């Protein structure tokens, strides 16, 4: 197994051969050596790796020396991976490798290993194609080396069985044999043996992994302990070294990088070190617990946190590394596959059978338990990510992706290490218990791991093959094949030679055709790498199979013993597995054990079958354990087995056959063997089916990891095991063909199986060649790659399940491709010749890859579009899909087993369907992926349909596969274009990734909304709780006082009665007093803190008093029982003393309580008064701020522009909205108390009836009493910053134009509708605003401004501004801005929710003060009281009373000019301001808006605007108080509307211009809302609103030009003081203005206009006289002053036929 592993390690720079990889990196020139050389070098590397593992165990610094070779690695990655691997293998591995092995702690075994390697060389010469066998042996070697290094580690590795030393010894023997097998392949095998053992040491050496990773990060102890485990641990160790070698890391990294680069190109090199480091950490933790399995699992998880998880045990660990390595390095992939296998076999390697099972189980357990369910998901995500990146890297994705994934994997690994730390202690139990159970948790991780493993097996293993001279794309694809080979290798390592057999056949076929492959691969790097990886993987698998046979013969006994122990540990699952092949979870472990035990002979009989069974033993024991435990472990085993079976039909077949043989032997009782054997002819399809089943099973396992109990046969592990069992059944079906061959003629089985495999491969190859589906299989890989890229583009699709499905799909497709290719290769390799098979496979793979790439590209595009369109549907259908998927999963599981029994194609179809179902299920878990998976099933079907189609597809595919199982088992499944073996899940990969990305975005948005809503609700609840707590605290305090008094009375009475009792009572009282003091002292400090803080103390005090009462009563009773003696003993003096003490204590406690209570009440009242004051001050300040804002927001003034723009944007909305719409948004604009009231009510004080509002305000005052202090402080700050606040609120954004600052009620309604605030009823729309306001209030209370920012949508301005606003801003009413931003930004980018602040604010401040009065009024009762008359006009606002009538609040805060117009404009203000501020907030304007403007828009605008802007008061006012005014205004507006409705037009006429000019006499800076109010006959849109605003801008321009002209004239005339400037009716200036604005003297110019003109003229005079006119924007200050002078426009201007009436 190590041979394949080592090969992949060489190719991928696996951890075991990391040093070798570094050496390889140094040896890119040796690329010529390519695969054959690479294999011998692998053997050497394996030897060296074993040494390195030992040395890694002892030194991790050598890998850093390899790290020096990291830079060569990139070049080699691009260069001939083979040569690089070979060079590294032969050269660097020998040097660094042995050094690394020395580190690994296999030092003791180095000699043995070298001997074994030489033996292996001999065998390798015979079984060069079976390097995987040697790898398996190496795994044992690793155990042996580990045993030599540290028996305790070895034991931990052999966790599954006490045979760890036995495994180590056997491993040594087997490793020796394997090494010889490796050697038999030449130095390649020996090298692989070394690498294998090193990798095994790393993978198995949990301690070693810990040694490498933990050695530096964790502990040398784990290293020493795991050192024995560290043969396989050495593999993990190298993995660890890659990641964690401070010194070893560089080496391991370089090594891994080289390999990974060689294989994945330079991408994995960087990633792999990170991944490897991750492994180190995880491995460190894991190695102790898993004893190599978990260490391997942890190590692999950490080294390829994703890679390891992807391997899910043997497969899981293998897979993630395959994923990360598959992307970037054969080292990773090899480590992935070998370490996966090693991880699987590591433990298995320790005891190939039980060790593999336990290793896989431990891996799965380590993954599941180390990382936990969520951690497993995270790992799965990381692994999926890494796999994506690995495959993307193989497809030419940047290394950064792999690096990112590896970094994520490292992070996960780091956390995994922590988890592994705990798992280290539990890994043995986990290994045994979680072989099945932990596998379920691991399944979730391994599932994605397994998926990754499956994907990476083809990907990583092919990458392992292709990495030697592969480009990233090819590497990725080859990575898929290679991963399968690696998976097979992992299965071989994990289960013994069978995967290696597959690997061997792959490697053998690939070795001869590797160079030819390279020439073809040069033409198509992707196909070339993939095919090369497949072929090399097959060679490795074949060699490994052969070596593993020898090693397995030796290991088999150990594995049998250990797996028997492991199966005993997993007896329930394993026995069930044996009993039920259908219960893959159960069957898996025992099948693995049984297969390892019983099928070792068969497996041995047939090198590949033997290899496959051992992988099943290991992969199935370990991988199946993993599979059952990790879904990917078993999947890894099955994917490894199946993928290996498909990869090298020989190795795959053997592997599958062995898996099936194992499963059959286990399932033989079930009769699946015979059934499996029945479809021997379609064994290739069966293999594909098995692979599909494995993929589907993996997905099922992954799904079962998510819902491992979906089928929960006996337990999560049972369900997983059942899934695995089904996988086993699938494998058995596939393998049963081989198994029949194997079993029927174990020696002959290989050839009959090969014949069947060959037939299948030929059929599949022909199908792949002929059908675009074969191309699509590869195209699916490419598509998957593309999807992976998209996922990378959308990293948010990191949900484990998403990755599980995506990885499963990728692995499925990649594994299916590589397995199919491998099947062809293995069949052709075994039957025809590896080269012929390789050529054929390469041809088919290249063609199919090209086809699949093109077809999948088109499909991916289509699917992406479909997914994009489905994203919403997916989110809706996900739940259904998940349910369906669960059902379908269960069905496919059963169907898979049944169909597997029926025929291999049903297995494929069942698995194919299962995988889509799983994918759907996973996709459901991965919202984005769920759609894609169904989409591949039926690109045009919705998720629900996809899930349904998944079920239908299952049956259809089953029937189709049944009918055409030999031809295109999967052709009929999802997309006909996809390859026969292309799993439906894979088909959905692209869509899944896209859908996952889209769904993730949608999901995140939903989550954000949910979070906002939840935050708002929480805030409301918190406020309510605070109130309740305050009440409770008060009650508790009262009770406490009462209790104290009662207790004191009791004590006094008792003291009189009992003398001694009095002493006791004194003590008790003292205690009570202390408690009371504590309670009182705590309440006192708490008095200054929120009531909730006090509540616990008071409650505690009350409880304490109650307890004291009970205790005192009991003690009193006891004392009373002793009354006679006590009384007699007590003297009067004592009693008096007691009484004095009690009195003093009582007095003190009572006084303290009274003081505390009084202080608290006083404090609260002060707070309330402060709140009221702050509310009033805030209202006043808000009015001032609004005035200032209006001035500042004068469109010419930056602030005005800023404020106006803020209306448009969430940030601008803060202040301009605060000024303009904040009044409507009183809750936010309101003072903290009012805001709290609104927030508390959630309906908003404005939305609530006045009583409710008052109650809420009262509660809010209580709640915000403290807030009020803060808010008053902040208000003071804001008061200081009032003007700045407007600027701050609206970061200076140039108001594009007045139009931009104008927002129509319709716009408001649109915005509100978009924000969900639009509902015509103010309540619903106001709820968001109220929530926002409440949030702001809570932020004020809790200073949770960020929540408000996120929830309120005003995060831009609110976070920084809301603190001041929420407190001071409450008075200032900047708080409301957050709601406005949604409104404003949503509706009009240019239109500001707040009308042009400068234009609108003047009105808002005075006539339109309702805007900021509502803000202030909402929070300010005084302002509301001041504006009660406006409240009459604007009854809809109690707090809006202020807003409705700015004069009161504005009267106090604003100029009298502003307030006087208010009485006149109240109705006008409300129509205008409410319409403007509320966008229909005013009843009359709302009515007009309803009738004239957009009835719904206006209503919703008015309501929503009222809600948002009024703080929901307007809506209530509309509903309640507004009805009164609405009746009045509606009568007016109804009239207007009657005339307006027919006149309702969006065209502005000269009449409107004349009307606007006349309006200029009252308002120079009208807001768009005001303009809309007074042009009810205009259906406002962005254009005409802008036009109106522009008119007023022109009016102002003319006005100011005249002002400046006459001011300069006055200066020239020598006027000394501005007071000398007087404007009379006959003044030239007045005449000019009147002529311009009132040409026909339609109306009498209001007196106030003369005052405004005079003031303006004087301001200009002052500025010119003072020389300020030299300044750039000297007029802005004047504009601000003038903007405050706007007066309410007479109501008759609202008449549509105003001018007609005038004329």
Swiss-Prot record:
Residues 1545-1603 form the Prospero-type homeo domain. Disruption phenotype: Embryonic lethal, results in the aberrant expression of the homeobox genes ftz, eve and en in a subset of neuroblasts, and in axonal outgrowth and pathfinding defects in both motoneurons and sensory neurons. Residues 1374-1384 have a biased composition (Pro residues). It is found in: Nucleus; Cytoplasm, Cell cortex; Cytoplasm. The keyword Coiled coil does not apply. Residues 1604-1703 form the Prospero domain. Residues 23-292, 322-357, 437-521, 608-692, 732-751, 823-844, 875-951, 1040-1101, 1197-1217, 1245-1389, 1418-1469 are annotated as: Disordered. GO terms for cellular component: apical cortex; basal cortex; cell cortex; nucleus; plasma membrane. Residues 36-53, 92-109, 137-188, 196-255, 274-292, 327-337, 346-357, 453-472, 618-642, 927-944, 1055-1076, 1252-1278, 1328-1348, 1438-1451 have a biased composition (Low complexity). Coiled coil: none annotated. InterPro entries: Homeo_prospero_dom (IPR023082), Homeo_prospero_dom_sf (IPR037131), Homeodomain-like_sf (IPR009057), Prospero_homeodomain (IPR039350). The record marks 1582, 1587, 1590-1591, 1594, 1597, 1676 as: Interaction with DNA. Homeodomain protein that controls neuronal identity. As a transcriptional factor, regulates the expression of ftz, eve and en in a subset of neuroblast progeny and modulates the transcriptional activity of other homeodomain proteins such as Dfd. Required for proper neuronal differentiation, axonal outgrowth and pathfinding of most or all neurons and their precursors in central and peripheral nervous systems. Regulates asymmetric stem cell self-renewal together with brat. This is Homeobox protein prospero.
